[in-house]
Amino acid sequence: MLDIQLLRKDLDGVAKRLADRGYTLDVAAFSALEAERRAIQTHTEELQARRNSLSKQIGAMKGKGEDTSAVMAEVGGIGDDMKASEAKLGEIQARLSDLMLGMPNVAHESVPVGKDEADNVEARRWGTPRQFDFEVKDHVDVGTPLGLDFETGAKLAGARFTMLRGPIARLHRALAQFMIDTHTQQHGYTETYTPYIVNPEILYGTGQLPKFADDMFRVEKGGAENTVTQYLISTSEISLTNTVRESIVDASALPIKLTAHSPCFRSEAGSYGRDTRGMIRQHQFDKVEMVQVVAPETSYAALDEMVGHAEAILQKLGLPYRVITLCTGDMGFSAAKTFDLEVWLPAQNTYREISSCSNTEAFQARRMQARFRNAQGKPELVHTLNGSGLAVGRTLVAVLENYQNADGSVTVPEVLRPYMGGMERIDAPAQAS
C-alpha cells in the first residue's frame, strides 16, 4: 500500500507515476473523499474541544453549588454528535482504504517507462545456446517417453496439471533439493516450511487481494452457516513475507533471509489459450522462493544480491539465460522494481521467464504493519523483497530441452548427479518386444 501522505502532498505527481504503470488514479474521487474526511475530522475535533470546555465548566459550577443540568444536557448532545461524526469518519476512512488497496506500487526512478513487455530492457546475458546436430524436440516430446504424463494429470484434475513418474519425478525433486541446498549453504537463507493454505488477510498483506482474487484457488471449510474462506498460496512469498506481519523486529535481526520449496496454485484466469502445451503454464507447480526483509537503505543492494542468487542456480546448471529489467507497465502490482531471468529454450528458439526478483520497498510492509526499530529506536517500516530461485517445473523444462540427446535420452547436469544417485543419463525404458 502506498503512503497516503504521499498522495496528500503530491496527488498529481503520484497520479502521473501510477499512469506510467497503466493505472488511472481517480484524482477527483480521492480529492472528494479527502475533503470530506478533513471536514468531518475538523468538526469532530471542534466537538471534542467544546465538550472538554463544558466539562471544565461543569466542575466549576458544581464547586459553586450551581445547577448544571442544562450544561450536562448540552454535553450529552455533543456526545451523540461525536458518535455520529466518528461513525461517518470511519466510513470515509474505510472508503479511502479500499481505494488505496487497489493502487499498485509506484516504480523506482531507475525503472524504464513503458507500456508492456515490448518496452522491457535487457541488462545482460550469460552462456551460449547449444548448437544441436539433430532436430530439437520440445520438452513434451523429450519428456513423455521418460515419465512426463500429461494424460493422467488431465484425467485426475483437468487441463494444466501434470503427472511425473520415475526418473523425471526424481529429476524434478533433485532440482528443488539442489536449489534449496545452494540457497541455504551458499547464500545465507534459512530453509522454511510454510502453510500452503492461508487466511485472506495474509493475501492482503502481500498484495494478491483484493485485486487478484480471480487468480487464486479458494477453499472453504465448515458448514453452510460457519463457512471459513481461505486460499491456496500462489507462491510461498505470501507465507514467508507475512512471517513479520504486525511485528517490530530489532535492527540487529536484519536482514531476514528465508527460502522455501512449495507447490504453488494459480487459476491462470485470463490466460486462456496461452502456453496450452506442456508444463510452461500450470495450475499447480513447484517453486523455490527467496524472501528478504531488510532495512530501507539496503534494499536495492539486496535486490542485486537476490538476482545474483537466482543467476547462480542457472549458471551451476549450465543453462543460458538473460536478465531483463521490467518496464513500468509490465511490473507486478506490489513491485517498485523487478528483474526477470529468462532461460533459453531451444525448441522455442527463445528465452522464457524462469525467475522474477522484485523489491517492493515498504509497499507490502505498510499493508502488513511490519516494522523494525531504527538507530533512533523508533519503529520504521521494513522493505521486503521476493524472488524465484527458481520455478522448478520450468527449470525441468529447460534441462530436458537443453540436455537432450539424439537417441532420446537426457544427460543429467553434473550438479544434480549427487541427488540422482550418480545417474549420468536418463534413458527411456526399454520397450517390451
UniProtKB/Swiss-Prot annotation:
* Compartments it resides in: Cytoplasm
Annotated residues that bind ATP are located at R266, S267, E268, E353, I354, S355, S356
Question: Under which main EC class is this enzyme filed?
Answer: ligase
Q: What is its main location?
A: cytoplasm
Keyword Iron attached: no
Question: What is this enzyme's catalytic activity, as reactions?
Answer: tRNA(Ser) + L-serine + ATP = L-seryl-tRNA(Ser) + AMP + diphosphate + H(+); tRNA(Sec) + L-serine + ATP = L-seryl-tRNA(Sec) + AMP + diphosphate + H(+)
The pathway entry for this protein reads as: Aminoacyl-tRNA biosynthesis; selenocysteinyl-tRNA(Sec) biosynthesis; L-seryl-tRNA(Sec) from L-serine and tRNA(Sec): step 1/1
Q: Which residues bind L-serine?
A: T235, S236, E237, E289, S388
Q: Which HAMAP family match?
A: Ser_tRNA_synth_type1
Q: Which family does it belong to?
A: Belongs to the class-II aminoacyl-tRNA synthetase family. Type-1 seryl-tRNA synthetase subfamily.
Per the record, the domain comment is: Consists of two distinct domains, a catalytic core and a N-terminal extension that is involved in tRNA binding.
Subunit details: Homodimer. The tRNA molecule binds across the dimer.
Role description: Catalyzes the attachment of serine to tRNA(Ser). Is also able to aminoacylate tRNA(Sec) with serine, to form the misacylated tRNA L-seryl-tRNA(Sec), which will be further converted into selenocysteinyl-tRNA(Sec).
Name of this protein: Serine--tRNA ligase
Species of provenance: Burkholderia cenocepacia (strain HI2424)
> Which taxonomic lineage does the organism of this UniProt entry have?
Bacteria, Pseudomonadati, Pseudomonadota, Betaproteobacteria, Burkholderiales
